[in-house]
């Protein structure tokens, strides 16, 4: 049986708090059962890109959300979910744009998790 793929949404794959937390979990999970794939909001490669790819994870790059690209951003997510029915779970670590993409994910039947790291 193939591993369940969970889509993790972050801003960048830098060595920040949320990113490091996710990577610590990712390194220790049984990736034959659960596999993390990532959506990031930058065209640039950062600290964890190579490690994620070496662990079998995919990285998808989205535009950074702002009010001026609201409708384009929504189209990107709709297109993504239409083209990737393999994802059943999305775990968002972004507070600002989660209100845009989580309802779209829900529309496509995904289980949604919104995780805030702001203290």
Residue ranges with predicted function:
Residues 6, 89, 105-119:
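Active-site proximal beta-strand in glycosyltransferases
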Residues 8-16, 20-72:
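N-terminal strand-loop element at the rim of the active site
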Residues 35, 39, 102-103, 107-109:
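Gram-negative host-targeted secretion-system effectors, predominantly Type III and Type IV
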Residues 40-44, 84-87, 96-97:
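Short, charged helix-to-loop "capping" segments that act as catalytic/coupling loops
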Residues 57, 82-85, 117:
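A generic structural signal for secondary-structure junctions
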Residues 64-89, 99-107:
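An amphipathic, basic-hydrophobic alpha-helix
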Residues 92-98, 116:
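Short His-centered aromatic/hydrophobic patch
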């Amino acid at each position: 049986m193939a591993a369940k793929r969970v889509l993790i949404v972050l801003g960048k794959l830098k060595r920040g708090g949320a990113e490091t937390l996710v990577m610590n979990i990712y390194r220790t999970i049984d990736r034959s059962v659960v596999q993390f794939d990532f959506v990031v909001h930058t065209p640039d490669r950062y600290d964890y890109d190579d490690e994620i790819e070496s662990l079998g994870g995919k990285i998808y790059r989205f535009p950074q959300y702002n009010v001026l690209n609201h409708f384009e951003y929504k189209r990107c997510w709709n297109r993504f979910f239409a083209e990737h029915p393999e994802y059943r779970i999305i775990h968002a670590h972004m507070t600002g744009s989660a209100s845009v993409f989580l309802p779209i994910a829900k529309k496509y039947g995904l289980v949604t998790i919104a995780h805030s790291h702001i203290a």
